[in-house]
Protein backbone atom coordinates (compact mmCIF):
# COMPACT_ATOMS: atom_id res chain seq x y z
CA UNK A 1 0.00 0.00 0.00
CA UNK A 2 1.50 3.32 -1.03
CA UNK A 3 2.42 5.71 1.78
CA UNK A 4 -0.16 8.32 0.80
CA UNK A 5 -2.98 5.75 0.85
CA UNK A 6 -1.80 4.42 4.23
CA UNK A 7 -1.83 7.96 5.64
CA UNK A 8 -5.30 8.55 4.23
CA UNK A 9 -6.62 5.33 5.79
CA UNK A 10 -5.13 6.20 9.19
CA UNK A 11 -6.73 9.61 9.09
CA UNK A 12 -10.07 8.06 8.17
CA UNK A 13 -9.83 5.56 11.02
CA UNK A 14 -9.05 8.36 13.47
CA UNK A 15 -12.01 10.35 12.19
CA UNK A 16 -14.24 7.28 12.53
CA UNK A 17 -13.09 6.71 16.13
CA UNK A 18 -14.02 10.32 16.84
CA UNK A 19 -17.47 9.82 15.30
CA UNK A 20 -18.01 6.57 17.21
CA UNK A 21 -17.14 8.21 20.54
CA UNK A 22 -19.60 11.04 19.80
CA UNK A 23 -22.35 8.55 18.93
CA UNK A 24 -21.79 6.47 22.08
CA UNK A 25 -22.08 9.56 24.27
CA UNK A 26 -25.13 11.00 22.54
CA UNK A 27 -27.93 8.75 23.79
CA UNK A 28 -28.92 6.42 26.64
CA UNK A 29 -30.70 4.07 24.22
CA UNK A 30 -27.99 1.41 23.93
CA UNK A 31 -29.55 -0.53 21.07
CA UNK A 32 -30.13 2.55 18.91
CA UNK A 33 -26.63 3.85 19.71
CA UNK A 34 -24.98 0.59 18.66
CA UNK A 35 -26.88 0.58 15.35
CA UNK A 36 -25.59 4.11 14.66
CA UNK A 37 -22.03 2.94 15.38
CA UNK A 38 -22.36 0.05 12.90
CA UNK A 39 -23.71 2.41 10.23
CA UNK A 40 -20.74 4.73 10.77
CA UNK A 41 -18.33 1.81 10.31
CA UNK A 42 -20.03 0.83 7.06
CA UNK A 43 -20.17 4.39 5.71
CA UNK A 44 -16.66 5.51 6.68
CA UNK A 45 -14.61 2.30 6.28
CA UNK A 46 -16.82 -0.06 4.25
CA UNK A 47 -17.09 -2.49 7.18
CA UNK A 48 -20.39 -4.13 6.20
CA UNK A 49 -22.89 -6.33 8.03
CA UNK A 50 -21.70 -5.19 11.45
CA UNK A 51 -23.00 -7.21 14.39
CA UNK A 52 -22.85 -6.52 18.15
CA UNK A 53 -23.55 -9.43 20.49
CA UNK A 54 -23.77 -9.03 24.29
CA UNK A 55 -23.56 -11.72 26.98
CA UNK A 56 -26.67 -12.30 29.07
CA UNK A 57 -26.89 -13.51 32.68
CA UNK A 58 -27.11 -17.08 31.36
CA UNK A 59 -23.72 -16.63 29.57
CA UNK A 60 -25.40 -16.74 26.13
CA UNK A 61 -24.45 -14.27 23.36
CA UNK A 62 -27.48 -12.46 21.97
CA UNK A 63 -27.54 -10.18 18.94
CA UNK A 64 -28.53 -6.67 20.08
CA UNK A 65 -27.61 -4.57 17.02
CA UNK A 66 -27.12 -5.49 13.33
CA UNK A 67 -26.89 -3.72 10.00
CA UNK A 68 -29.52 -4.97 7.58
CA UNK A 69 -31.63 -6.90 10.16
CA UNK A 70 -34.83 -5.88 11.91
CA UNK A 71 -35.00 -5.87 15.70
CA UNK A 72 -37.40 -8.83 15.62
CA UNK A 73 -35.04 -10.92 13.48
CA UNK A 74 -32.01 -9.95 15.53
CA UNK A 75 -33.73 -10.97 18.78
CA UNK A 76 -33.91 -14.59 17.57
CA UNK A 77 -30.17 -15.00 17.03
CA UNK A 78 -27.91 -16.24 19.83
CA UNK A 79 -24.67 -18.18 20.30
CA UNK A 80 -23.52 -20.25 23.23
CA UNK A 81 -19.99 -20.35 24.59
CA UNK A 82 -17.73 -21.94 21.93
CA UNK A 83 -20.50 -22.22 19.33
CA UNK A 84 -19.48 -21.14 15.81
CA UNK A 85 -16.91 -18.45 15.15
CA UNK A 86 -18.72 -15.90 17.35
CA UNK A 87 -18.92 -18.37 20.24
CA UNK A 88 -15.20 -19.13 19.86
CA UNK A 89 -14.36 -15.45 20.25
CA UNK A 90 -16.43 -15.35 23.45
CA UNK A 91 -14.75 -18.47 24.82
CA UNK A 92 -11.16 -17.53 23.99
CA UNK A 93 -11.40 -13.76 24.42
CA UNK A 94 -9.21 -13.41 21.31
CA UNK A 95 -9.89 -11.79 17.89
CA UNK A 96 -10.70 -14.04 14.94
CA UNK A 97 -10.28 -13.53 11.16
CA UNK A 98 -11.94 -15.67 8.47
CA UNK A 99 -10.47 -14.73 5.03
CA UNK A 100 -13.22 -16.55 3.09
CA UNK A 101 -16.52 -17.32 4.83
CA UNK A 102 -17.63 -19.60 2.00
CA UNK A 103 -14.81 -22.01 2.81
CA UNK A 104 -15.06 -21.89 6.62
CA UNK A 105 -16.80 -24.98 8.13
CA UNK A 106 -17.29 -23.29 11.53
CA UNK A 107 -19.27 -20.44 9.97
CA UNK A 108 -22.97 -21.00 10.80
CA UNK A 109 -24.43 -18.06 8.81
CA UNK A 110 -27.28 -17.60 11.27
CA UNK A 111 -27.72 -13.94 10.38
CA UNK A 112 -27.84 -14.58 6.61
CA UNK A 113 -27.68 -11.70 4.09
CA UNK A 114 -24.69 -12.98 2.11
CA UNK A 115 -26.49 -14.82 -0.71
CA UNK A 116 -26.19 -11.95 -3.27
CA UNK A 117 -22.40 -11.70 -3.30
CA UNK A 118 -22.04 -13.43 -6.73
CA UNK A 119 -18.30 -13.54 -7.40
CA UNK A 120 -17.36 -11.38 -4.42
CA UNK A 121 -15.53 -12.81 -1.43
CA UNK A 122 -16.70 -12.06 2.11
CA UNK A 123 -14.17 -12.04 4.92
CA UNK A 124 -15.12 -11.81 8.61
CA UNK A 125 -13.24 -9.95 11.34
CA UNK A 126 -14.41 -10.39 14.94
CA UNK A 127 -13.07 -9.01 18.22
CA UNK A 128 -14.18 -9.46 21.83
CA UNK A 129 -15.89 -6.60 23.65
CA UNK A 130 -14.30 -6.28 27.06
CA UNK A 131 -15.11 -4.24 30.17
CA UNK A 132 -12.87 -4.29 33.24
CA UNK A 133 -10.97 -7.20 31.70
CA UNK A 134 -14.08 -9.36 31.30
CA UNK A 135 -15.54 -10.36 27.91
CA UNK A 136 -19.06 -8.94 27.76
CA UNK A 137 -19.74 -9.32 24.04
CA UNK A 138 -18.45 -9.71 20.47
CA UNK A 139 -18.18 -7.24 17.57
CA UNK A 140 -18.00 -8.63 14.00
CA UNK A 141 -17.88 -7.01 10.54
CA UNK A 142 -17.59 -8.25 6.94
CA UNK A 143 -15.02 -7.15 4.41
CA UNK A 144 -16.23 -7.55 0.80
CA UNK A 145 -13.59 -7.92 -1.94
CA UNK A 146 -13.82 -8.34 -5.70
CA UNK A 147 -10.24 -9.57 -5.97
CA UNK A 148 -10.30 -12.57 -3.64
CA UNK A 149 -9.42 -12.83 0.03
CA UNK A 150 -7.23 -10.13 1.46
CA UNK A 151 -3.93 -11.18 2.91
CA UNK A 152 -3.64 -8.76 5.83
CA UNK A 153 -6.30 -7.83 8.41
CA UNK A 154 -4.02 -6.52 11.17
CA UNK A 155 -5.11 -2.89 10.85
CA UNK A 156 -8.81 -3.93 10.91
CA UNK A 157 -8.26 -5.97 14.09
CA UNK A 158 -6.50 -3.06 15.82
CA UNK A 159 -9.16 -0.57 14.78
CA UNK A 160 -12.11 -2.80 15.75
CA UNK A 161 -10.45 -3.51 19.11
CA UNK A 162 -10.49 0.23 19.86
CA UNK A 163 -14.15 0.45 18.84
CA UNK A 164 -14.98 -2.63 20.95
CA UNK A 165 -13.28 -1.06 23.98
CA UNK A 166 -15.43 2.06 23.60
CA UNK A 167 -18.54 -0.11 23.33
CA UNK A 168 -17.48 -2.10 26.40
CA UNK A 169 -17.17 1.05 28.52
CA UNK A 170 -20.56 2.24 27.30
CA UNK A 171 -22.15 -1.10 28.18
CA UNK A 172 -20.55 -1.10 31.65
CA UNK A 173 -21.35 2.50 32.63
CA UNK A 174 -25.04 1.91 33.54
CA UNK A 175 -24.03 -1.05 35.72
CA UNK A 176 -21.35 1.02 37.46
CA UNK A 177 -23.89 3.77 38.15
CA UNK A 178 -26.38 1.24 39.52
CA UNK A 179 -23.91 -0.54 41.81
CA UNK A 180 -24.15 1.99 44.69
CA UNK A 181 -27.94 1.88 44.40
CA UNK A 182 -27.93 -1.91 44.42
CA UNK A 183 -25.55 -1.98 47.37
CA UNK A 184 -27.72 0.47 49.27
CA UNK A 185 -30.84 -1.56 48.51
CA UNK A 186 -29.09 -4.77 49.52
CA UNK A 187 -27.97 -3.18 52.79
CA UNK A 188 -31.50 -1.91 53.45
CA UNK A 189 -33.03 -5.32 52.84
CA UNK A 190 -30.42 -7.02 55.00
CA UNK A 191 -31.10 -4.52 57.78
CA UNK A 192 -34.82 -5.23 57.56
CA UNK A 193 -34.19 -8.95 57.65
CA UNK A 194 -31.75 -8.83 60.57
CA UNK A 195 -34.42 -9.17 63.28
CA UNK A 196 -35.60 -12.33 61.51
CA UNK A 197 -32.41 -14.12 62.50
CA UNK A 198 -32.53 -17.87 62.73
CA UNK A 199 -32.85 -19.26 66.27
CA UNK A 200 -29.56 -20.45 67.73
CA UNK A 201 -28.92 -23.36 70.04
CA UNK A 202 -31.68 -23.62 72.65
CA UNK A 203 -32.61 -19.93 72.50
CA UNK A 204 -36.39 -19.82 72.10
CA UNK A 205 -37.70 -16.39 71.19
CA UNK A 206 -40.33 -14.60 69.15
CA UNK A 207 -40.33 -11.15 70.77
CA UNK A 208 -38.81 -8.26 68.78
CA UNK A 209 -36.23 -7.34 71.43
CA UNK A 210 -34.89 -10.91 71.62
CA UNK A 211 -34.88 -11.24 67.84
CA UNK A 212 -32.71 -8.14 67.75
CA UNK A 213 -30.39 -9.82 70.26
CA UNK A 214 -30.19 -12.84 67.94
CA UNK A 215 -29.36 -10.57 65.01
CA UNK A 216 -26.66 -8.91 67.10
CA UNK A 217 -25.20 -12.33 67.94
CA UNK A 218 -25.05 -13.17 64.23
CA UNK A 219 -23.27 -9.88 63.51
CA UNK A 220 -20.64 -10.11 66.25
CA UNK A 221 -19.89 -13.85 66.14
CA UNK A 222 -17.44 -13.87 63.17
CA UNK A 223 -15.08 -11.39 64.82
CA UNK A 224 -12.60 -11.64 67.69
CA UNK A 225 -13.95 -8.58 69.50
CA UNK A 226 -14.55 -8.82 73.25
CA UNK A 227 -18.25 -9.10 74.13
CA UNK A 228 -19.90 -7.96 77.37
CA UNK A 229 -23.27 -9.62 78.01
CA UNK A 230 -25.46 -7.77 80.51
CA UNK A 231 -28.72 -8.90 82.01
CA UNK A 232 -30.45 -10.10 85.12
CA UNK A 233 -29.82 -13.53 86.58
CA UNK A 234 -31.61 -16.25 84.67
CA UNK A 235 -31.86 -14.42 81.35
CA UNK A 236 -29.51 -16.83 79.55
CA UNK A 237 -26.17 -15.04 79.41
CA UNK A 238 -24.14 -18.25 79.20
CA UNK A 239 -26.42 -19.56 76.46
CA UNK A 240 -25.75 -16.45 74.37
CA UNK A 241 -22.00 -16.73 75.06
CA UNK A 242 -21.98 -20.33 73.81
CA UNK A 243 -23.96 -19.30 70.75
CA UNK A 244 -21.38 -16.62 69.89
CA UNK A 245 -18.59 -19.19 70.24
CA UNK A 246 -20.40 -21.85 68.18
CA UNK A 247 -21.01 -19.39 65.34
CA UNK A 248 -17.45 -18.04 65.31
CA UNK A 249 -14.37 -19.30 63.42
CA UNK A 250 -13.21 -20.67 66.81
CA UNK A 251 -16.12 -23.08 67.13
CA UNK A 252 -13.85 -26.15 66.94
CA UNK A 253 -11.58 -24.78 69.70
CA UNK A 254 -12.36 -24.97 73.44
CA UNK A 255 -15.09 -22.95 75.15
CA UNK A 256 -13.95 -22.47 78.75
CA UNK A 257 -16.30 -21.04 81.39
CA UNK A 258 -15.28 -19.53 84.73
CA UNK A 259 -17.73 -18.29 87.37
CA UNK A 260 -15.76 -15.48 88.97
CA UNK A 261 -18.23 -15.12 91.85
CA UNK A 262 -17.83 -18.76 92.92
CA UNK A 263 -14.08 -18.59 93.62
CA UNK A 264 -12.08 -16.59 96.19
CA UNK A 265 -9.38 -14.31 94.83
CA UNK A 266 -6.46 -16.63 95.62
CA UNK A 267 -8.12 -19.61 93.97
CA UNK A 268 -9.39 -17.53 91.04
CA UNK A 269 -5.84 -16.47 90.16
CA UNK A 270 -4.69 -20.08 90.11
CA UNK A 271 -7.71 -21.15 88.06
CA UNK A 272 -7.26 -18.46 85.43
CA UNK A 273 -3.47 -18.31 85.15
CA UNK A 274 -2.45 -21.76 86.44
CA UNK A 275 0.35 -22.49 88.91
CA UNK A 276 3.74 -24.16 89.04
CA UNK A 277 4.58 -27.16 91.17
CA UNK A 278 5.36 -26.04 94.72
CA UNK A 279 3.88 -22.57 94.24
CA UNK A 280 1.84 -23.05 97.43
CA UNK A 281 0.86 -25.76 99.85
CA UNK A 282 -0.87 -28.54 97.96
CA UNK A 283 0.53 -27.58 94.54
CA UNK A 284 2.01 -31.00 93.84
CA UNK A 285 2.23 -30.58 90.06
CA UNK A 286 2.03 -27.97 87.34
CA UNK A 287 -1.50 -26.81 86.59
CA UNK A 288 -2.64 -25.11 83.38
CA UNK A 289 -4.96 -22.15 83.87
CA UNK A 290 -8.14 -21.38 81.98
CA UNK A 291 -6.40 -18.79 79.79
CA UNK A 292 -3.95 -21.47 78.71
CA UNK A 293 -6.65 -24.09 78.17
CA UNK A 294 -8.79 -21.69 76.14
CA UNK A 295 -5.95 -20.62 73.81
CA UNK A 296 -7.30 -20.53 70.27
CA UNK A 297 -10.86 -20.63 71.59
CA UNK A 298 -13.19 -18.61 73.80
CA UNK A 299 -12.95 -17.79 77.52
CA UNK A 300 -16.25 -16.90 79.20
CA UNK A 301 -15.87 -14.96 82.45
CA UNK A 302 -19.26 -15.08 84.16
CA UNK A 303 -20.08 -12.59 86.94
CA UNK A 304 -16.99 -10.52 86.16
CA UNK A 305 -18.37 -7.66 88.24
CA UNK A 306 -17.77 -9.68 91.43
CA UNK A 307 -13.98 -9.92 91.22
CA UNK A 308 -11.93 -7.77 93.61
CA UNK A 309 -10.22 -4.54 92.48
CA UNK A 310 -6.80 -6.06 93.24
CA UNK A 311 -7.39 -8.98 90.90
CA UNK A 312 -8.89 -6.68 88.26
CA UNK A 313 -5.44 -5.12 87.77
CA UNK A 314 -3.90 -8.55 87.08
CA UNK A 315 -6.69 -9.42 84.67
CA UNK A 316 -6.30 -6.11 82.84
CA UNK A 317 -2.65 -6.82 82.07
CA UNK A 318 -3.50 -10.20 80.53
CA UNK A 319 -6.23 -8.69 78.37
CA UNK A 320 -3.93 -5.92 77.15
CA UNK A 321 -0.78 -7.94 76.53
CA UNK A 322 -2.30 -11.39 75.82
CA UNK A 323 0.39 -12.88 78.06
CA UNK A 324 0.73 -13.95 81.70
CA UNK A 325 2.80 -15.96 84.17
CA UNK A 326 1.56 -18.88 86.21
CA UNK A 327 1.37 -18.49 89.97
CA UNK A 328 4.84 -19.24 91.31
CA UNK A 329 6.39 -19.15 87.82
CA UNK A 330 8.49 -16.67 85.89
CA UNK A 331 7.98 -17.91 82.32
CA UNK A 332 5.77 -15.64 80.23
CA UNK A 333 3.05 -17.56 78.41
CA UNK A 334 1.38 -16.17 75.30
CA UNK A 335 -2.31 -16.82 74.80
CA UNK A 336 -4.84 -16.20 72.05
CA UNK A 337 -8.36 -16.17 73.44
CA UNK A 338 -11.59 -14.44 72.58
CA UNK A 339 -13.03 -13.00 75.77
CA UNK A 340 -16.75 -12.96 76.54
CA UNK A 341 -17.78 -11.46 79.89
CA UNK A 342 -21.13 -11.40 81.65
CA UNK A 343 -22.55 -9.60 84.65
CA UNK A 344 -25.86 -8.75 86.28
CA UNK A 345 -24.37 -5.75 88.11
CA UNK A 346 -24.34 -2.08 87.21
CA UNK A 347 -20.65 -1.68 86.37
CA UNK A 348 -20.97 2.07 85.92
CA UNK A 349 -22.26 2.40 89.48
CA UNK A 350 -19.54 0.05 90.72
CA UNK A 351 -16.91 2.29 89.10
CA UNK A 352 -18.40 5.29 90.91
CA UNK A 353 -18.12 3.43 94.22
CA UNK A 354 -14.53 2.37 93.53
CA UNK A 355 -15.42 -1.32 93.26
CA UNK A 356 -14.60 -1.74 89.58
CA UNK A 357 -11.69 -0.33 87.60
CA UNK A 358 -12.60 2.07 84.82
CA UNK A 359 -9.71 0.89 82.62
CA UNK A 360 -10.89 -2.72 82.86
CA UNK A 361 -14.43 -1.58 82.08
CA UNK A 362 -13.31 0.09 78.87
CA UNK A 363 -11.24 -2.98 77.98
CA UNK A 364 -14.17 -5.42 78.19
CA UNK A 365 -16.96 -3.08 77.07
CA UNK A 366 -16.24 -3.36 73.34
CA UNK A 367 -19.47 -4.94 72.11
CA UNK A 368 -22.32 -4.93 74.62
CA UNK A 369 -25.34 -7.20 74.36
CA UNK A 370 -28.26 -6.44 76.70
CA UNK A 371 -30.55 -9.38 77.47
CA UNK A 372 -34.06 -8.20 78.36
CA UNK A 373 -35.74 -9.72 81.43
CA UNK A 374 -38.58 -12.15 80.81
CA UNK A 375 -41.20 -9.63 81.98
CA UNK A 376 -40.16 -7.39 79.06
CA UNK A 377 -40.51 -10.18 76.48
CA UNK A 378 -43.86 -11.71 77.40
CA UNK A 379 -44.33 -12.98 73.86
CA UNK A 380 -41.66 -15.56 74.68
CA UNK A 381 -43.32 -16.98 77.81
CA UNK A 382 -45.65 -19.27 75.84
CA UNK A 383 -42.99 -20.69 73.47
CA UNK A 384 -40.54 -21.08 76.36
CA UNK A 385 -43.11 -22.87 78.50
CA UNK A 386 -43.93 -25.32 75.70
CA UNK A 387 -40.21 -25.84 75.09
CA UNK A 388 -39.62 -26.73 78.75
CA UNK A 389 -42.67 -29.00 78.79
CA UNK A 390 -41.35 -30.88 75.75
CA UNK A 391 -37.87 -31.03 77.27
CA UNK A 392 -39.17 -32.47 80.55
CA UNK A 393 -41.28 -35.03 78.69
CA UNK A 394 -38.30 -36.14 76.58
CA UNK A 395 -35.94 -36.35 79.56
CA UNK A 396 -38.41 -38.45 81.53
CA UNK A 397 -39.80 -40.57 78.68
CA UNK A 398 -43.40 -39.46 79.06
CA UNK A 399 -46.17 -37.57 77.31
CA UNK A 400 -46.85 -34.14 78.78
CA UNK A 401 -49.02 -31.21 77.70
CA UNK A 402 -50.07 -27.90 79.27
CA UNK A 403 -53.58 -26.47 79.42
CA UNK A 404 -54.19 -23.04 77.93
CA UNK A 405 -55.54 -21.83 81.28
CA UNK A 406 -52.26 -22.72 82.97
CA UNK A 407 -50.37 -20.88 80.25
CA UNK A 408 -52.49 -17.78 80.84
CA UNK A 409 -51.51 -17.88 84.52
CA UNK A 410 -47.83 -18.02 83.57
CA UNK A 411 -48.28 -15.06 81.23
CA UNK A 412 -49.49 -12.91 84.14
CA UNK A 413 -46.49 -13.63 86.38
CA UNK A 414 -43.59 -11.20 86.78
CA UNK A 415 -40.76 -13.78 86.80
CA UNK A 416 -38.07 -12.03 88.86
CA UNK A 417 -35.91 -15.13 88.28
CA UNK A 418 -36.52 -14.85 84.52
CA UNK A 419 -36.17 -17.90 82.24
CA UNK A 420 -34.50 -20.01 84.93
CA UNK A 421 -37.46 -19.46 87.26
CA UNK A 422 -39.91 -20.31 84.47
CA UNK A 423 -38.09 -23.57 83.76
CA UNK A 424 -38.14 -24.52 87.44
CA UNK A 425 -41.83 -23.63 87.67
CA UNK A 426 -42.63 -25.87 84.70
CA UNK A 427 -40.60 -28.72 86.19
CA UNK A 428 -42.38 -28.39 89.55
CA UNK A 429 -45.75 -28.33 87.85
CA UNK A 430 -44.83 -31.35 85.73
CA UNK A 431 -43.99 -33.39 88.82
CA UNK A 432 -47.40 -32.49 90.29
CA UNK A 433 -49.37 -33.51 87.19
CA UNK A 434 -51.02 -36.89 87.57
CA UNK A 435 -52.28 -37.62 84.07
CA UNK A 436 -49.66 -35.94 81.87
CA UNK A 437 -51.54 -32.63 81.81
CA UNK A 438 -50.26 -29.49 83.53
CA UNK A 439 -53.32 -27.70 84.86
CA UNK A 440 -53.71 -24.47 86.79
CA UNK A 441 -53.87 -26.35 90.09
CA UNK A 442 -50.47 -27.91 89.32
CA UNK A 443 -48.71 -24.53 89.42
CA UNK A 444 -46.84 -23.32 92.48
CA UNK A 445 -49.21 -20.40 92.97
CA UNK A 446 -52.08 -22.78 93.67
CA UNK A 447 -49.95 -24.78 96.12
CA UNK A 448 -48.82 -21.70 98.13
CA UNK A 449 -45.23 -22.35 97.02
CA UNK A 450 -44.69 -19.26 94.87
CA UNK A 451 -41.98 -17.05 96.38
CA UNK A 452 -41.95 -14.53 93.55
CA UNK A 453 -43.87 -11.98 95.60
CA UNK A 454 -41.19 -11.84 98.30
CA UNK A 455 -38.36 -11.64 95.77
CA UNK A 456 -40.19 -9.00 93.78
CA UNK A 457 -40.63 -6.85 96.89
CA UNK A 458 -36.90 -6.75 97.58
CA UNK A 459 -36.04 -6.31 93.91
CA UNK A 460 -38.38 -3.33 93.66
CA UNK A 461 -36.63 -1.86 96.69
CA UNK A 462 -33.35 -2.28 94.83
CA UNK A 463 -31.91 -5.01 97.03
CA UNK A 464 -29.92 -7.98 95.76
CA UNK A 465 -31.47 -11.12 97.19
CA UNK A 466 -29.42 -14.30 97.12
CA UNK A 467 -27.53 -13.27 94.00
CA UNK A 468 -30.72 -12.25 92.21
CA UNK A 469 -30.03 -8.92 90.58
CA UNK A 470 -32.32 -6.00 91.33
CA UNK A 471 -34.65 -4.91 88.59
CA UNK A 472 -32.37 -3.34 86.03
CA UNK A 473 -32.63 -1.66 82.69
CA UNK A 474 -29.83 -1.36 80.20
CA UNK A 475 -27.65 0.32 82.76
CA UNK A 476 -29.45 1.18 85.96
CA UNK A 477 -29.29 -0.87 89.13
CA UNK A 478 -30.19 0.70 92.45
CA UNK A 479 -28.26 -1.13 95.13
CA UNK A 480 -29.67 0.98 98.02
CA UNK A 481 -33.30 0.26 98.91
CA UNK A 482 -35.02 3.65 98.81
CA UNK A 483 -36.72 4.72 101.97
CA UNK A 484 -35.01 2.33 104.38
CA UNK A 485 -34.48 3.62 107.92
CA UNK A 486 -31.85 6.32 108.09
CA UNK A 487 -31.44 6.67 104.31
CA UNK A 488 -33.39 9.34 102.42
CA UNK A 489 -35.34 8.04 99.45
CA UNK A 490 -34.91 9.65 96.03
CA UNK A 491 -37.90 11.53 94.75
CA UNK A 492 -38.53 9.05 91.95
CA UNK A 493 -37.89 5.92 93.99
CA UNK A 494 -40.23 3.03 93.08
CA UNK A 495 -42.60 1.98 95.80
CA UNK A 496 -42.63 -1.67 96.76
CA UNK A 497 -45.87 -3.43 95.85
CA UNK A 498 -48.10 -4.46 98.68
CA UNK A 499 -47.52 -8.01 99.85
CA UNK A 500 -50.39 -10.34 98.94
CA UNK A 501 -52.50 -11.56 101.80
CA UNK A 502 -51.70 -15.07 103.03
CA UNK A 503 -54.08 -17.88 102.20
CA UNK A 504 -55.92 -18.97 105.38
CA UNK A 505 -54.47 -22.08 106.99
CA UNK A 506 -55.66 -24.40 109.72
CA UNK A 507 -55.14 -23.30 113.29
CA UNK A 508 -51.62 -23.79 114.49
CA UNK A 509 -50.12 -23.86 111.01
CA UNK A 510 -47.63 -21.17 110.14
CA UNK A 511 -46.48 -20.06 106.71
CA UNK A 512 -42.94 -18.82 106.46
CA UNK A 513 -43.69 -16.98 103.19
CA UNK A 514 -46.64 -14.91 101.96
CA UNK A 515 -48.41 -16.87 99.23
CA UNK A 516 -50.30 -16.02 96.06
CA UNK A 517 -54.05 -16.26 96.24
CA UNK A 518 -56.36 -18.13 93.85
CA UNK A 519 -53.53 -19.64 91.89
CA UNK A 520 -52.85 -16.39 90.08
CA UNK A 521 -56.03 -16.87 88.06
CA UNK A 522 -58.44 -14.15 89.09
CA UNK A 523 -56.86 -10.96 87.86
CA UNK A 524 -53.72 -8.86 87.74
CA UNK A 525 -51.53 -8.25 90.75
CA UNK A 526 -48.13 -6.62 91.21
CA UNK A 527 -46.37 -9.97 91.09
CA UNK A 528 -48.18 -12.98 89.71
CA UNK A 529 -51.21 -11.34 88.21
CA UNK A 530 -53.58 -12.66 90.85
CA UNK A 531 -56.30 -10.51 92.34
CA UNK A 532 -55.51 -9.93 95.99
CA UNK A 533 -57.97 -8.96 98.73
CA UNK A 534 -57.59 -5.43 100.00
CA UNK A 535 -56.60 -6.65 103.47
CA UNK A 536 -53.24 -5.50 104.84
CA UNK A 537 -50.73 -8.07 105.99
CA UNK A 538 -51.11 -8.54 109.75
CA UNK A 539 -48.19 -6.92 111.55
CA UNK A 540 -46.99 -8.54 114.76
CA UNK A 541 -45.38 -6.01 117.09
CA UNK A 542 -42.16 -7.00 118.77
CA UNK A 543 -42.29 -6.96 122.59
CA UNK A 544 -39.84 -4.42 123.90
CA UNK A 545 -38.45 -4.10 127.44
CA UNK A 546 -40.08 -1.55 129.68
CA UNK A 547 -38.35 1.81 129.31
CA UNK A 548 -36.78 3.28 132.41
CA UNK A 549 -38.07 6.73 131.57
CA UNK A 550 -41.11 7.91 129.66
CA UNK A 551 -40.39 7.84 125.97
CA UNK A 552 -40.88 10.92 123.89
CA UNK A 553 -43.88 10.95 121.63
CA UNK A 554 -43.12 9.58 118.22
CA UNK A 555 -43.36 12.10 115.41
CA UNK A 556 -46.18 11.84 112.95
CA UNK A 557 -45.34 9.67 109.96
CA UNK A 558 -44.36 11.52 106.81
CA UNK A 559 -44.27 10.50 103.17
CA UNK A 560 -40.93 9.05 102.10
CA UNK A 561 -41.12 10.96 98.86
CA UNK A 562 -41.89 14.36 100.33
CA UNK A 563 -39.70 14.57 103.43
CA UNK A 564 -36.66 12.94 104.95
CA UNK A 565 -37.47 10.00 107.25
CA UNK A 566 -37.12 10.41 111.02
CA UNK A 567 -34.01 9.14 112.83
CA UNK A 568 -33.60 5.39 112.94
CA UNK A 569 -34.27 5.17 116.67
CA UNK A 570 -37.65 6.85 116.24
CA UNK A 571 -38.95 4.71 113.36
CA UNK A 572 -41.79 2.51 114.68
CA UNK A 573 -41.14 -1.15 113.98
CA UNK A 574 -44.68 -1.73 112.85
CA UNK A 575 -44.67 1.14 110.36
CA UNK A 576 -47.18 -0.03 107.65
CA UNK A 577 -45.08 1.33 104.74
CA UNK A 578 -42.07 -0.60 105.96
CA UNK A 579 -43.75 -4.00 105.50
CA UNK A 580 -44.13 -6.70 108.16
CA UNK A 581 -41.52 -6.97 110.88
CA UNK A 582 -40.47 -10.40 109.66
CA UNK A 583 -39.88 -9.05 106.15
CA UNK A 584 -37.90 -6.07 107.46
CA UNK A 585 -35.85 -8.39 109.62
CA UNK A 586 -35.06 -10.68 106.67
CA UNK A 587 -34.13 -7.67 104.58
CA UNK A 588 -31.77 -6.31 107.22
CA UNK A 589 -30.10 -9.69 107.80
CA UNK A 590 -29.56 -10.17 104.06
CA UNK A 591 -28.14 -6.68 103.75
CA UNK A 592 -25.66 -7.15 106.58
CA UNK A 593 -24.47 -10.66 105.76
CA UNK A 594 -26.49 -12.18 108.63
CA UNK A 595 -24.58 -10.25 111.31
CA UNK A 596 -27.12 -9.54 114.08
CA UNK A 597 -25.30 -6.51 115.49
CA UNK A 598 -25.22 -4.79 112.09
CA UNK A 599 -28.85 -5.67 111.42
CA UNK A 600 -29.82 -4.23 114.79
CA UNK A 601 -28.15 -0.91 113.97
CA UNK A 602 -29.82 -0.87 110.56
CA UNK A 603 -33.25 -1.38 112.11
CA UNK A 604 -32.69 0.89 115.11
CA UNK A 605 -33.02 -2.07 117.50
CA UNK A 606 -30.82 -3.76 120.05
CA UNK A 607 -28.98 -6.98 119.32
CA UNK A 608 -31.13 -8.70 121.94
CA UNK A 609 -34.32 -7.61 120.19
CA UNK A 610 -33.04 -8.93 116.85
CA UNK A 611 -32.06 -12.26 118.42
CA UNK A 612 -35.49 -12.57 120.03
CA UNK A 613 -37.25 -11.78 116.74
CA UNK A 614 -35.20 -14.37 114.84
CA UNK A 615 -36.26 -17.05 117.33
CA UNK A 616 -39.87 -15.90 117.34
CA UNK A 617 -40.24 -16.15 113.57
CA UNK A 618 -38.16 -19.33 113.26
CA UNK A 619 -35.64 -17.64 111.00
CA UNK A 620 -32.58 -19.83 110.61
CA UNK A 621 -29.26 -18.00 110.76
CA UNK A 622 -27.22 -18.50 107.59
CA UNK A 623 -23.60 -19.43 108.18
CA UNK A 624 -20.91 -18.47 105.66
UniProtKB/Swiss-Prot annotation:
Keywords: Activator, ATP-binding, DNA-binding, Metal-binding, Nitrogen fixation, Nucleotide-binding, Transcription, Transcription regulation, Two-component regulatory system. Residues 477-508, 549-578 are annotated as: Disordered. GO terms for molecular function: ATP binding; ATP hydrolysis activity; DNA-binding transcription factor activity; metal ion binding; sequence-specific DNA binding. A divalent metal cation binds at residues 445, 450. Residues 582-624 are annotated as: C-terminal DNA-binding domain. PROSITE patterns: SIGMA54_INTERACT_1, SIGMA54_INTERACT_2, SIGMA54_INTERACT_3, SIGMA54_INTERACT_4. Residues 549-563 have a biased composition (Low complexity). Residues 203-431 form the Sigma-54 factor interaction domain. Residues 596-615 bind DNA. Residues 432-581 are annotated as: Inter-domain linker. Residues 29-171 form the GAF domain. Required for activation of most nif operons, which are directly involved in nitrogen fixation. Interacts with sigma-54. This is Nif-specific regulatory protein. It comes from Azospirillum lipoferum.
Amino acid sequence: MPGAMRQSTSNLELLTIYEVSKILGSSLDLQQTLREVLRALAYQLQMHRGRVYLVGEDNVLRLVAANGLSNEAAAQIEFRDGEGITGRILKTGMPAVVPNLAEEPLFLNRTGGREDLDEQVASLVGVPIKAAGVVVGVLTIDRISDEGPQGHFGSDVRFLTMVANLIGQTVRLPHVAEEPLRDAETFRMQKELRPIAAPINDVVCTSPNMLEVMAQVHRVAPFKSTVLIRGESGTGKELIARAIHNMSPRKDAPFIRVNCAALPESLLESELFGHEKGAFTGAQKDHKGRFELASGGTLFLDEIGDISPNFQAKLLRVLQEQEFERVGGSKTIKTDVRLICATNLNLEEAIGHGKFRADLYFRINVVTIHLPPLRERRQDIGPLARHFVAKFAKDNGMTLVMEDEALEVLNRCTWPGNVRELENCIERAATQSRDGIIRTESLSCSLNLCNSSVLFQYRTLGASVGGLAPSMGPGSVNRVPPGRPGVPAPANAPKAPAMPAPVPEPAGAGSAWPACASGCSAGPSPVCGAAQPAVPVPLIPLPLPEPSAPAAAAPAPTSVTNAAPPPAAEVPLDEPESGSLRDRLLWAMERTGWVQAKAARLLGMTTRQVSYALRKYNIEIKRF
